[in-house]
UniProtKB/Swiss-Prot annotation:
<keyword id="KW-0716">Sensory transduction</keyword>
<feature type="topological domain" description="Cytoplasmic">
    <location>
        <begin position="121"/>
        <end position="139"/>
    </location>
</feature>
<keyword id="KW-0807">Transducer</keyword>
<feature type="topological domain" description="Extracellular">
    <location>
        <begin position="1"/>
        <end position="25"/>
    </location>
</feature>
<keyword id="KW-0297">G-protein coupled receptor</keyword>
<dbReference type="GO" id="GO:0005886">
    <property type="term" value="C:plasma membrane"/>
</dbReference>
<feature type="transmembrane region" description="Helical; Name=1">
    <location>
        <begin position="26"/>
        <end position="49"/>
    </location>
</feature>
<keyword id="KW-0552">Olfaction</keyword>
<comment type="similarity">
    <text>Belongs to the G-protein coupled receptor 1 family.</text>
</comment>
<feature type="transmembrane region" description="Helical; Name=3">
    <location>
        <begin position="101"/>
        <end position="120"/>
    </location>
</feature>
<dbReference type="InterPro" id="IPR000725">
    <property type="entry name" value="Olfact_rcpt"/>
</dbReference>
<keyword id="KW-0472">Membrane</keyword>
<feature type="topological domain" description="Extracellular">
    <location>
        <begin position="80"/>
        <end position="100"/>
    </location>
</feature>
<dbReference type="InterPro" id="IPR000276">
    <property type="entry name" value="GPCR_Rhodpsn"/>
</dbReference>
<feature type="glycosylation site" description="N-linked (GlcNAc...) asparagine">
    <location>
        <position position="5"/>
    </location>
</feature>
<dbReference type="GO" id="GO:0004984">
    <property type="term" value="F:olfactory receptor activity"/>
</dbReference>
<keyword id="KW-1015">Disulfide bond</keyword>
Length: 313
């Protein structure tokens, strides 16, 4: 092998979702609309919860954090893809690739664990209602989320430091629309076993473990709901949990497939389709899922919109 090829990459070429030029206009229009809906929906949720003092509770504190993280996760990947689709410029410098990779995993880890925290919050509210205020205090929730952000920062930085030591030779074309660990690792001509082992360890900690905790929480919730004597009480409890279960299915259904399935099973098409789900579709749908069946949140959103209309008139 020639010495000149044994160097770190100066840039990568992100091939995007499709290599067919005739599809780029359609993809741009679709993802631009999805991104716009995501931005408006999540910012409205954050503003409504911040302004309405009745929503200053642990459940809505977690929801506001989830909306913020969803906004950041999508913003880290979608705008770059839109620029590539519009201009045809698919190149991304190596430092920018590492930065995008860092923030993708930073926000992805926070997203995953916050969803588990929300499940535990529902478990305490339904199974231990008399002790809810003591167990789930806002101060404790703030400490948990702060610790989570610090933990996510450390894990994401470790990923980047392990990636920065690799050497890339041959093709620098990435069959993806953003810089993720697995597609970039495939381009390295050095040993990536440490990186892959760390990915599995982290996936176990921040995907598999929260998912098991969610299943355990909802198993206990289901048992508690079945003991409720009135049909109205059971319906209210199911309604409280159904929106969160929809988010769990959307998020973990795709991330488990990408980070915990054997690489031999995961094709490039499946990998990109799964990435679209958790970087674009889920962040766009979450505001609708959480607000459609939540009267308190819908009321806060109406107040916010009416306030804006009144102030502008």
């Amino acid at each position: 092998m020639e010495p000149r090829n044994q160097t770190s990459a100066s840039q990568f070429i992100l091939l995007g979702l499709s290599e067919k030029p005739e599809q780029e206009t359609l993809l741009f229009s679709l993802f631009f609309c999805m991104y716009l809906v995501m931005v408006v929906g999540n910012l409205l949720i954050i503003l409504a919860i911040s302004i309405d003092s009745h929503l200053h509770t642990p459940m809505y504190f977690f929801l506001a954090n989830l909306s913020l993280v969803d906004f950041c996760l999508a913003t880290n990947t979608i705008p770059k893809m839109l620029v590539s689709l519009q201009t045809g410029s698919k190149a991304i410098s190596y430092p920018c690739c590492l930065i995008q990779m860092y923030f993708f995993h930073f926000f992805g880890i926070v997203d995953s664990v916050i969803i588990a925290m929300m499940a535990y919050d529902r478990f305490v509210a339904i199974c231990h209602p008399l002790h809810y205020a003591k167990i789930m205090s806002l101060r404790l929730c703030r400490l948990l989320v702060g610790a989570l952000w610090a933990f996510s920062c450390f894990i994401s930085l470790t990923h980047i430091l392990l990636m920065a030591r690799l050497v890339f030779c041959g093709s620098h074309e990435v069959p993806h629309y953003f810089c993720d660990l697995t597609p970039i690792l495939r381009l390295s001509c050095t040993d990536t076993s440490v990186n892959r082992i760390f990915i599995l360890i982290v996936a176990g900690m921040v995907i598999a473990t929260p998912f098991v905790c969610i299943l355990a929480s909802y198993a206990r919730i289901l048992v508690a709901i079945m003991k409720v004597p009135s049909a109205g009480g059971r319906k209210k409890a199911f309604s409280t949990c159904s929106s969160h279960l929809s988010v769990v299915a959307l998020f973990y259904g795709t991330t488990i497939g990408v980070y915990l399935c054997p690489s031999s099973v995961l094709t490039t098409v499946k990998e990109k389709a799964s990435a679209v789900m958790y970087t674009a579709v889920t962040p766009m749908l979450n505001p609708f899922i959480y607000s459609l069946r939540n009267r308190d949140l819908k009321g806060a959103l109406r107040k916010l919109v009416n306030r804006k209309i009144t102030s502008s008139s």
